[in-house]
Amino acid sequence: PAVYGFRYNARVLARRLAERVAGIERDTRPLGKDEAVPFLLAELAHAPELWAQKAYLARVVSFDGAPRDDGIEPLAHFVDAAGPDAVAATVELDASGEIYPVLYVRRRGSIHERVLPPDPLNRFHEPGYRAEVEAAVREVE
């Protein structure tokens, strides 16, 4: 049997150990002012980490001055830890098996979630989702 998500969990753990034990700072990638929304939409629609580890891993974009791709983090860590204003995007599954995207918005230390509607074809990059992601990003810019 396949072990789905193992490689993503190993990558997250290795990065966390490098930060805590070796003092190696996380590589983050700056995003242009207009890149954050399309980047998050693409991640919701296609990121294998999010699809293999639904509601466990999230793509994080922070907004401490300028938008930065902070990479993949465990969702629980994003929700529980302090940090700069940011948006964490993940894909979740309800009890009936319906898949839907969720944005967790951290602003001034408080977290709230924006649950987006499901799409039967998982087209989370479509215009309706763009408006939702834009609204979340505006909260933290």
Which stretches of residues belong to each language-model region?
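Rossmann-like nucleotide/phosphate-binding core characteristic of flavoprotein oxidoreductases
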Residues: 4, 8, 16-141
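Short FAD-binding loop at a beta-strand-to-alpha-helix junction that anchors the flavin cofactor
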Residues: 1
